[in-house]
Amino acid sequence: MITKQTIFSCAELADSIRTFLTADTLLLDIETSGLSAARHFIYCIGCSYLSPDKSDSITVQLFFAEKQEQEAELLAALTTLLQTHKRIITFNGNSFDLPFLKKRYEINHIKQPFSDTQSVDLYREACHLKNLIQL
């Protein structure tokens, strides 16, 4: 498994962003080898969060599986992050990312870490605006 981490300094991080990007918030996206969680696997998990020791910095972390056998390592890395991040923000995550993740945890015989997490799906939040922004 390849792990890449970059920390961005954001001293000008707007107060409006800080209202939803709190210390316990994890921005999450996954990349998969296909659309079926039963037949395909996760090869990349991307996460962003406020850096623990620097409130004016954002950490971006990517976990990349070079082969399917490394998927369990990706899931374990996400589990570790979710120990300190209890709110997940995704785009269409309630319909795709989270169900896919839950199935892959099950297939890999790893306990799912989502029981204590709150999910915010930006796609669902913005759906009522789709006519306004011509989606």
Q: What does each model-found stretch correspond to?
A:
Residues 14-18, 35, 78-79, 108-109:
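Short, flexible, glycine/charge-rich loop motifs used to bind or transfer phosphoryl groups or to couple energy/partner
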